[in-house]
C-alpha cells in the first residue's frame, strides 16, 4: 500500500465512510476507491483535490498523512 492509499483509507475510516459511500460522493466506482487504497492505481491531482474536499481535509493530509499535517511537519 502506498502512502496516499494508506492515508486515504485512514481518513475514510475516520469519517466512518465505506468505500461505497466515498465512491458515491466522488461519482466513481467502489473499485476505483479500493484501487487507490491498495496502491494498484493512484488518483490524479484533480481527484486528490476532490478526495480532500469529500473528506474535509487539506490535500496535504492525503499526501503526507493526517498526523504530519496536524504537527506541521510537512515540507
Q: Predicted segments — roles?
A:
Residues 1-14:
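A short, Lys/Arg-rich alpha-helix, primarily the initiator
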Residues 46-61:
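DNA major-groove recognition helix of helix-turn-helix/homeodomain DNA-binding modules
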Residues 63-75:
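Short, charged recognition helix plus adjacent turn
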Amino acid at each position: 500500500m502506498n502512502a496516499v492509499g494508506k492515508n486515504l483509507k485512514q481518513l475514510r475510516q475516520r469519517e466512518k465512510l465505506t468505500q461505497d459511500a466515498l465512491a458515491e460522493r466522488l461519482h466513481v466506482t467502489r473499485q476505483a476507491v479500493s484501487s487507490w487504497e491498495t496502491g494498484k492505481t493512484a488518483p490524479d491531482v484533480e481527484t486528490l483535490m476532490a478526495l480532500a474536499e469529500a473528506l474535509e481535509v487539506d490535500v496535504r493530509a492525503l499526501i503526507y498523512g493526517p498526523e504530519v499535517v496536524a504537527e506541521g511537519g510537512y515540507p
